[in-house]
Design a protein with these regions (language model features):
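Active-site-adjacent beta-strand anchor residues
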Residues: 35-38, 131-132
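Conserved S-adenosyl-L-methionine
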Residues: 30, 52-62
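Reductase modules of NAD(P)H-dependent flavoproteins
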Residues: 63-169
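Hydrophobic structural packing positions in well-ordered secondary structure
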Residues: 11-14, 45, 80, 130
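FAD-binding FR-type
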Residues: 1-35, 48-51, 96-97, 154-169
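Hydrophobic/small residue at the entry helix of a nucleotide-binding pocket
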Residues: 40-45, 137
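A generic secondary-structure signal
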Residues: 22, 48-55, 82, 116-120
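Short, flexible active-site-adjacent loop segments at beta-strand->alpha-helix junctions, enriched
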Residues: 20, 39, 135
Length: 169
């Protein structure tokens, strides 16, 4: 997408669509939400996080596992760091190339990290997991997403016992 936009010339037309709501969230719909995002996959997560944060009556606990290559790549960092002050939110950063003084997690988001930080599959309807990121990450965590469809549950989340109805990718 970025290279396409970069190749545009003055006067070229660019069509946008959206926003297109894909998950109709209701306040307090879940007790806990787990989110796994990679890179620009943070965009839909931010929309839901911002919605929950702006509703003080929404008691949903949200944990975000957010992976990037470098610390400079973390989008919305100031907003997420501010949200850490709200007890409803837990934000955990993962970096592939972490600086020496890095306090967050390193490497890819693993099965162990998902199990450590996110709600458990046994929570059933009380918890929900959202996944958005590069296709290899989504496939590894939740199984492949089919164009316009969720696709079957797979990857780490299936190994941890999650069912399709508990996951949105």
């Amino acid at each position: 997408m970025t290279s396409y936009i970069g190749d545009l010339k003055p006067g070229d037309k660019l069509m946008f669509k959206g926003p297109i709501p894909k998950f109709p969230y209701k306040s307090n719909q879940f007790e806990e939400i787990g989110m796994i995002a990679g890179g620009t996959g943070i965009t839909p997560m931010w929309q839901l996080i911002d919605h929950i944060a702006s509703d003080k009556n929404d008691k949903t606990k949200v944990t975000l596992l957010y992976s990037n290559k470098t610390e400079e790549d973390i989008l919305l960092r100031e907003k997420f760091d501010e949200l850490k002050k709200d007890p409803r939110f837990n934000i955990v950063y993962f970096l592939d190339k972490a600086p020496k003084n890095w306090q967050g997690e390193t490497g890819f988001i693993s099965k162990e990290a998902v199990d450590k930080y996110l709600p458990k599959a046994e929570a059933g309807e009380k918890a929900h997991i959202f996944v958005c990121g590069p296709p290899p990450q989504v496939k590894s965590i939740a199984g492949p997403k089919v164009a316009g469809q969720q696709g079957e549950i797979g990857g780490v989340l299936k190994e941890l016992g999650f069912k399709s109805e508990q996951v949105f990718k």
